[in-house]
Design a protein with these regions (language model features):
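Residues within the alpha-helical elements of helix-turn-helix
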Residues: 32, 81-82, 97
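Short glycine/serine/threonine/alanine-rich loop segments
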Residues: 35, 84, 100
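A short, Lys/Arg-enriched amphipathic alpha-helix from helix-turn-helix/homeodomain DNA-binding modules
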Residues: 1-24, 30-35, 53-73
Length: 113
C-alpha cells in the first residue's frame, strides 16, 4: 500500500510537471514511472479520480491560477499553456466544471469575488 501511494504521488508530480504538453498521456507517465499503462490506471482507479480526470482538473486549476495572476494574458494563450489542444475544448471543459465561461471567471476574479 505504501508503494502504491508513493507511485501515485510520483505520477501526480509527473502530471504537474508535464501539464503544458497537450500530448500528456498515460503511456508517457507510465514509462517515466517504469510501470505498465494498466498498472498506472489501477493506481488512479484506487484513488478518487481517473488519470484523465486528474490531468483535466490540474489543467483547469492551473488555468484559473494564471487568469488571476496574469489578467492581461489572452485566454487562448492560457489554455494552450495549460495543455489544452483547442480553445473550444477548453471552454467546454471549463464551463462543465465551473458553470461559467473562462471570461466570466476572470471578470469575477478581477472584481475580487
Amino acid at each position: 500500500a505504501a508503494l502504491r501511494t508513493a507511485r501515485l504521488s510520483q505520477a501526480r508530480r509527473l502530471i504537474a510537471r508535464h501539464l503544458q504538453d497537450p500530448h500528456l498521456a498515460p503511456a508517457m507517465v507510465a514509462d517515466l514511472l517504469g510501470v505498465s499503462v494498466r498498472h498506472l490506471h489501477m493506481l488512479f482507479e484506487a484513488a478518487e479520480k481517473s488519470f484523465s480526470q486528474t490531468v483535466t482538473d490540474e489543467r483547469l486549476k492551473q488555468s484559473r491560477r494564471l487568469m488571476r495572476e496574469a489578467p492581461e494574458r489572452l485566454i487562448a494563450d492560457i489554455a494552450a499553456s495549460c495543455g489544452f489542444e483547442s480553445l473550444a475544448t477548453y471552454y467546454r471543459v471549463f464551463n462543465a466544471a465551473y458553470g461559467m465561461a473562462p471570461g466570466d471567471f476572470r471578470a469575477r476574479a478581477s472584481d475580487g469575488l
